[in-house]
């Protein structure tokens, strides 16, 4: 009797059984089976080696508490199977402390016997404590405090460096622009002599641009000359009309050695004339500058004319007391005697004619400043 499937099923079963090993042999995932089977003996060998090392390590002899807790721990573990080993250790410690000496004596004697036996078995034994794993704990704590997710990558670090350099460049350029020249309000009404010449009609740098007396702010070089111009004889602006006395005065002051700031202040002719340091725009506006002269300039011309008349009448410098003007001067007392002494020692041709002029001009300047004119 023929089968209901007409013999196809048997042929399919034979074909599948024959083709299955051929197909399985082409894939690589079938090979690790042998590797897995071969890996089992290796793991067994590693575990056996660890056990042999543990057995080879010499243990320390037990003390009385360990001898007593060996059997007591087992009893507590059977009574309280849910308790953790740490809880069992706490309970054993409390119960051991509560025991009296008579109860502890057999365990103490057993511990002493084990110690003697250990010495006999291992005469060269030396206790070597295990290394504490503090380094690994510290590393773990650092990883917890500083997780790797918060550490920026190399690209972020490069971006931070570029941003820092850009900010530093902007800051340096801003500082350079701010430090090149002071603010506009700094030069308003200021002069090299400061307090002593604040009441005079000194032309300001920052006036209206529409006025004829307007001049641009000083450059950096002019600002340096302004701040350090006390001892220099640089005169960017001079009067067009000079008297013979002023010519003698300029020639003599160039020969005076400048040993202190007071000498430099008294040696510059613009200090006597009441003229402050003016920028180069003063040359382009001589009319506007001449209209703003101080009263000391007019009085100076009168003093010089009176001095010429007194020289023609035969007055000598010996008739003048050199110390009577000290009470009117607002400078340091040593500045004028030093200047007088230096001028007296000068052997120039105009040394005898310069002293009265200097004293009268200094008195005139200080008088106007004291009276607030």
Swiss-Prot record:
Disordered, as annotated region: 33-55
Single annotated GO MF: RNA polymerase II cis-regulatory region sequence-specific DNA binding
Cross-referenced Gene3D superfamilies: High mobility group box domain (1.10.30.10)
Region (Required for transcriptional activity and interaction with ctnnb1): 324-328
InterPro entries according to UniProt: HMG_box_dom, HMG_box_dom_sf, Sox_C, SRY-related_HMG-box_TF-like
Motif annotated as 9aaTAD, chain positions: 323-331
Keyword terms of this UniProt record: Activator, Developmental protein, DNA-binding, Gastrulation, Nucleus, Transcription, Transcription regulation, Wnt signaling pathway
Keyword Transcription applies: yes
Location(s) in or outside the cell: Nucleus
GO biological process: cell differentiation; gastrulation; positive regulation of transcription by RNA polymerase II; Wnt signaling pathway
A GO cellular-component term linked to this record: nucleus
Annotated Basic and acidic residues bias: 39-55
Regions recorded as binding DNA: 58-126
Residues covered by the Sox C-terminal domain: 256-373
Role noted for this protein: Transcription activator. Doesn't appear to bind to the consensus 5'-AACAAT-3' DNA binding site, but binds 5'-ATTGTT-3'. All of the sox17 proteins are required for embryonic endoderm development and gastrulation movements, and show some redundancy in function. In addition, the sox17 proteins have distinct but overlapping roles in later gut development. Acts downstream of vegt-signaling in endoderm differentiation to induce a range of endodermal genes both directly and indirectly. Also represses wnt-responsive genes to inhibit wnt/beta-catenin-mediated signaling.
Domain-related comment: The 9aaTAD motif is a transactivation domain present in a large number of yeast and animal transcription factors.
Subunit structure: Interacts (via C-terminus) with ctnnb1/beta-catenin (via Armadillo repeats); this interaction is required for inhibition of wnt-signaling.
PANTHER family: SOX TRANSCRIPTION FACTOR, TRANSCRIPTION FACTOR SOX-17-BETA.3
Name of the protein in question: Transcription factor Sox-17-beta.3
Species in which this protein is naturally found: Xenopus laevis (African clawed frog)
Name of encoding gene: sox17b.3
